[in-house]
Amino acid sequence: MSKKDIQFNLRIPEELKAKIDAAAKANQRSINAEATSRLYDSFVMNDNIQVEAAKIVENFLRARSPTERKKVVAKRLNFVLSELKKIYHFNEFTIAELAFEINEDTADEAEAWFRAELEPTFGQLEKIAQHTSVNPNWLLFGKQTPYDIQHIRLNEYLDQDIKLLVGSNPNNEYLNNSKVKEIKFIRELSEAGQLIILKIYENYAVETFYPPYHISDVNGVGGYNSLLYFCLLTKVLLRYYKSKVNVYSHLLSEEQFKLILTGTVHPLTIAEKLHHIPWVDDLADKLPNKNLDYWDGFDTLRARILRDFAAKEFIQEIWNDPELHLKHPIEF
């Protein structure tokens, strides 16, 4: 026995003694050597476990420590949630509900995204963008604007434009799985009378269109012919689709109109507060037969449109087609 070794008596269960005996024989060493080795290893093992545990905690904390990317993404996410909660339908919307909507199993990780502790995957960010009507390029990479303004010209073919306004968007899975419930035609209260069209789905997703149309006399020949077509399109929508899709028209100040066009606000935060003003219904309709004065110059424009709408042969051919009611590109 070494001078440094200390002898002491240890009472152990008989079953444990038998296991030590068997292990000593298997390892070809004495019972004392076997017991000493196992005691020593148990302390080393505990030290190793502590080191591994420390590494796990360190990695966990590092993973949840804010980085510049996490901070930027969290700022965007909090902006999106803030804008969404300004809308009546979403004013009590929570991160947990958002996590459920995008098929997360729990809300724990989603809440960590908003605190800049974890970074969502690109796929998760794309789902959030779809469910909140946000521009994915902005949410993922900070490019463009938070809300996409689609600068488009109507095709000026009824079938195509009815599909554009009333049909679901086949290029977006979330939109394609929902139906359009409402269309808003918003005219700027200005001399030119620019136009924004909002296409609102049953799931409250929204698409924003900004066609180069002026609802006014501030038009060249081509622009005025496009305005006549626009009147034909809206008359068809009101005649055949209003029972399935709500069609509203509004007037909006220049300041608020331009704010929507910046793409920095959710359009419904402004549009849902507007009152319905039926200028779309009345612009190419001779009834009611009285001045309506929706804006300065409305009644003069209306009189001109009524005259030219009736004089355009191709418009009258379409509008008076006895089979027009059968030519619906959208089925509900």
Residue ranges and their predicted role:
Residues 122-138:
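DNA major-groove recognition helix of helix-turn-helix/homeodomain DNA-binding modules
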Residues 29-50, 145-146:
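Short, basic amphipathic alpha-helical segments that act as recognition/interaction helices
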Residues 39, 138-157:
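Short amphipathic recognition helices of helix-turn-helix/homeodomain-type DNA-binding modules
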Residues 7, 101-120:
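Recognition helix of helix-turn-helix/homeodomain-like DNA-binding domains
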Residues 275-332:
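Charge-dense, extended regions
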Residues 1-5, 52-101:
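A short, Lys/Arg-rich alpha-helix, primarily the initiator
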Residues 1-16, 21-29:
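Short Lys/Arg-rich basic patches
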Residues 162-295, 299:
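Long, charge-rich C-terminal accessory regions
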